[in-house]
């Protein structure tokens, strides 16, 4: 995946994900001047021990570097986790559009974060069934911990975000009776203080 993004930044070609699920086991850096889209909402999933430490969170996708200007367009994707990854920041957004020439050219359109509740996440009703009669502890919730954060927009960054949503599953989508489930996620979206406009 990293080589594909690096190549696209040089060639100007659009990165196109065929429909399917793609596992990411360490940070992928998205350079500026990349356009990314998918067929029928392919799924990009953070998984593995690299993302296991909630005291040392790491991004799955790191878009640009802090203070970097450029264009990145992401559309028609779903971001998930496979298994508990309490140290995963699903997207770290570092890039800022050069608003003098290309206002709102760094952004995410029609892409969504969905944590648990669906096939392949390993965070479903067979593991994380809601049980209101049981006291939950950090240890007992370990197998049902989603991510550290869905989206972190860092200082000096900005973006245009349209038709995006984040959902930490409260019920099953793909198994049996679609009962309620308990998934524990650290944060949703943090937009650090910036003097740049975001939309």
Mark where each language-model region is:
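Extracellular/periplasmic carbohydrate-active domains that bind, remodel
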Residues: 1-199
